[in-house]
Amino acid sequence: MTDILDELDAGRAPLAPTLADLRGDWARAEPSAHLQRLESESIHILREVAAEFAKPVMLYSIGKDSSVLLHLAMKAFAPGKPPFPLLHVDTTWKFREMIEFRDQRMRELGLDLIVHINPDGVAQGIGPFSHGSALHTDVMKTQGLRQALEAHGFDAAIGGARRDEEKSRAKERIFSHRSAAHRWDPKNQRPELWSLYNTLLAPGESMRVFPLSNWTERDVWDYILVEQIPIVPLYFAALRPVVERDGALIMVDDARMPLRPGEVPQLRSVRFRTLGCYPLTGAMPSTATTLEQIVDEMLASRSSERQGRVIDRDSTGSMERKKAEGYF
């Protein structure tokens, strides 16, 4: 395994497209009226959060939705910077390219980024291989997020979740109320009429806000193309070392991944439709190296955007249950 990782690192540039390569291929186009309406709604929501809450924060998970959300936030408050910090809950198992991209974007934009790692999880050595996906996700993501929100006293957390991603998210409000214990009750949601939002909170309560609620996966990709938004190169097809495990193509991103008997990493042309912790995120065979090709693949697909997320397969890990416990 070490040999193939060393080989990949040594020749990484020609295998995976760089941000400069990708930007050079993107032709700027005018946004459609549909995208303009979505953009206007999202910017209105972001400004509403800044006006109504004492200490908001924006979750930055480095994926395509977070990249669109960050771009919208920069637009909403231009020529100034967003009046709230960004927060990344780092599980320590993200793809290396994701962390490199995160740090590069923060340097380019000069933004305030808070990176939180659950110290209890680190002390216990919690990881997806040693403890399983369910416990890893709960400790390093859900509990880590709650720790960060409480430590900094944030009363509103902005995220990039969309209603078309998953059925429990489809029924969640744009302004989603959370109890003092960060719990979401799907049976106790507030009405949202037109663009009027109830932002009132009792002491200790908080709000999760989703400005991209009404966007679809296609909308996100169209907007990325039109606005030339930088995204992690992992979304584009390239030769990457993968093993087939439990029906998923798992990328061997570093030497921490233990190989099972008979497993040998193979370089295959793959990309990722969604991003998370690398041991829990399956790749898809692909030759799509442009945004147009990605959209074509997506339109031809009959599978869920989150099909590669191993955490969604846990019998006790439904999205609604995780959200009720404080997951974003």
Swiss-Prot record:
GO molecular function, one term: ATP binding
Top-level EC class: transferase
Cross-referenced InterPro entries: PAPS_reduct_dom (IPR002500), Rossmann-like_a/b/a_fold (IPR014729), SO4_adenylTrfase_ssu (IPR011784), Sulfate_adenylyltrnsfr_sub2 (IPR050128)
Any one GO biological process: sulfate assimilation
UniProtKB keywords: ATP-binding, Nucleotide-binding, Nucleotidyltransferase, Transferase
Domain of life: Bacteria
Region annotation (Disordered) ranges: 305-328
Family, as annotated: Belongs to the PAPS reductase family. CysD subfamily.
Protein purpose: With CysN forms the ATP sulfurylase (ATPS) that catalyzes the adenylation of sulfate producing adenosine 5'-phosphosulfate (APS) and diphosphate, the first enzymatic step in sulfur assimilation pathway. APS synthesis involves the formation of a high-energy phosphoric-sulfuric acid anhydride bond driven by GTP hydrolysis by CysN coupled to ATP hydrolysis by CysD.
NCBIfam families: CysD, PRK05253.1, PRK12563.1
Protein name (database record): Sulfate adenylyltransferase subunit 2
